[in-house]
Amino acid sequence: MQKWEAPRARPSIAYNDPVTSDFITRLPKAELHLHLEGSVDPLTLSQLSEKHHTPFPWANNRYQPLPNSHRPLTVAEAAALYDYTDFTGFLMAFKAVTERLRDPEDFELIAYRLVEKLAAQGCLHAEVFVSVGVIFWRGQEFDPLFEGLERGRIRGEKDFGVSLYWIFDAVRHFGPEEAEKVVATAIRLQASSVIGIGIGGDERLAAPELFAQVYAQAARAGLRLSVHAGETVGAPSIYGALDVLGAERLGHALHAGDDAALLSRLVHQQVPLELCLTSNLRTGCCAELALHPLRRYFDAGALVILNTDDPEMFQTTLVREYQLAQDVFGFTNEELRQLAANSFRASWLPQERKRKLLNLL
């Protein structure tokens, strides 16, 4: 059988925004909160849909396919999936992507295209979440898919000079047993490219205490620890991430400012805060962009980093996030340079590589 090859897609990095400054595009930077599946653009989703136009062969009855998943999506239909107005719409878009990621070549394709897009934005390093918990939940065999990921990463690094680490992501509301599978797999495949674990999903449905043993196991194995916390609920979730799970970085942390003592601690300990402006706006976690705590956290001395979260699904780019910081929050070029420096400092790169990247600023 002839190997399927998708038509070449160019990076889609403009979303009807004002022209961004050359300074921002050229500014060396890293991205530390980015979901692989959320980087799939409508053209690629349409191509995957054409390739896989039969219902997914579910290995269990826990996960139901979307309506019309038996036919290919046009590019326009794929783009329309990303034009949602609430969190449910986002989940449907995410599901539409994961349904069509079925074989190693699919993962190789999206990993390679992600590296290409990052390079176009002056991003020199990224630490990328892979939804391993979802893959297991669907009954897929992970190892062959990981081999595809690695091929895409290695080709991308060679062609574009952008380094990538993988963070294996579990899902809170799937429970601790499913999370343990994710951690065990990260430990088994731990190498230079598998750097850590994360956990996302609904903070309201599963307390941090449920995952304490899982995170302790990961820490003993030398994996780095990230936690989505304070995105949809308040400060207690962040305290749990820090004190129960031992989080080294916090995803979103929107509600850290609700508790003055907590914010002071985050500043004092320089815990990296992975902020995602457009994501928080589009999911409704932040009512309007001007209310986002980016400026407050930065001025308080917190170690904040700008990120895209799910760039294609939120119709943003890392360049656009930096431009928003300047246009909406008044960040100067020098302050943007500080944000870029934060992204390198908060990364899990070796110290020598960090120094080399920081010297570029």
Please identify what each model-predicted range represents:
Residues 3-4, 65:
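Cationic, low-complexity basic patches in intrinsically disordered or flexible, solvent-exposed regions
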Residues 15-223, 232-237, 244, 248-249, ...:
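Metal-cofactor-binding active-site regions of metalloenzymes
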